[in-house]
Amino acid sequence: MSIFTPTNQIRLTNVAVVRMKRGGKRFEIACYKNKVVGWRSGVEKDLDEVLQTHSVFVNVSKGQVAKKEDLISAFGTDDQTEICKQILTKGEVQVSDKERHTQLEQMFRDIATIVADKCVNPETKRPYTVILIERAMKDIHYSVKPNKSTKQQALEVIKQLKEKMKIERAHMRLRFLLPVNEGKKLKEKLKPLMKVVESEDYSQQLEIVCLIDPGCFREIDELIKKETKGKGSLEVLSLKDVEEGDEKFE
């Protein structure tokens, strides 16, 4: 599709229009096809790679640019880049049924890939294949949400799959190096956040190697920094504690 915009004499091609209604008026932005989903999923972070122009339109196909007073009334600002971000994040993508179906299929696969990459069977510590995660998602009738990032949806899928199968996020392996004086007291605070303590060594420092749920990493990191006043250290030994091989389920 080629759109001619007489206001600035730019011919926009390969256009995906994202629309938002605000304050009783319609606002549109012109994006590159296949880039909107990437922005919303967090894969694409460069706004210039997504937007064909930083202008806000009332009608992209006719090249009608929104009036400054209408932007201020609807969005509280006339900063078109910021308004473009709002529309890009929350607006409705104008695509054909075929394009929408293709996008949703791709997001479905992306979500399954994230889940397969981050999770294991807790009994065998082995990962599931992407194909089997896709099958499980279909079994629970998971419906992709086009306006939500694939990472957020992957977390939702994991929660729902836990009710139907043996699955959990793979543990991270960490090493703590803590001053001996603060270490013993800090260890008690860290205990509830550690899944498995693999080794402890008391010498000049307290060294602990353990497995944790990835969701606890930030809390542990902040706790160590706060309690040791920067004297302690935290090292990630492995992001995923898994066994080799693929776990299959029917």
UniProtKB/Swiss-Prot annotation:
Belongs to the SDO1/SBDS family. Associates with the 60S ribosomal subunit. Interacts with NPM1, RPA1 and PRKDC. May interact with NIP7. Found in a complex consisting of 60S ribosomal subunit, SBDS and EFL1. Interacts with CLN3. GO terms for cellular component: cytoplasm; cytosol; nucleolus; nucleoplasm; nucleus; spindle pole. GO terms for molecular function: microtubule binding; ribosome binding; rRNA binding. GO terms for biological process: bone marrow development; bone mineralization; cytosolic ribosome assembly; hematopoietic progenitor cell differentiation; inner cell mass cell proliferation; leukocyte chemotaxis; mitotic spindle organization; rRNA processing. It is found in: Cytoplasm; Nucleus, Nucleolus; Nucleus, Nucleoplasm; Cytoplasm, Cytoskeleton, Spindle. Required for the assembly of mature ribosomes and ribosome biogenesis. Together with EFL1, triggers the GTP-dependent release of EIF6 from 60S pre-ribosomes in the cytoplasm, thereby activating ribosomes for translation competence by allowing 80S ribosome assembly and facilitating EIF6 recycling to the nucleus, where it is required for 60S rRNA processing and nuclear export. Required for normal levels of protein synthesis. May play a role in cellular stress resistance. May play a role in cellular response to DNA damage. May play a role in cell proliferation. InterPro entries: Ribosome_mat_SBDS_CS (IPR018023), Ribosome_mat_SBDS_N_sf (IPR036786), Sdo1/SBDS (IPR002140), Sdo1/SBDS-like (IPR039100), SDO1/SBDS_C (IPR046928), SDO1/SBDS_central (IPR018978), Sdo1/SBDS_central_sf (IPR037188), SDO1/SBDS_N (IPR019783). Its main location: cytoplasm. Pfam families: SBDS_C, SBDS_domain_II, SBDS_N. Keywords: Acetylation, Cytoplasm, Cytoskeleton, Nucleus, Phosphoprotein, Ribosome biogenesis. The modification N-acetylserine is found at S2. The modification Phosphoserine is found at S238. This is Ribosome maturation protein SBDS.
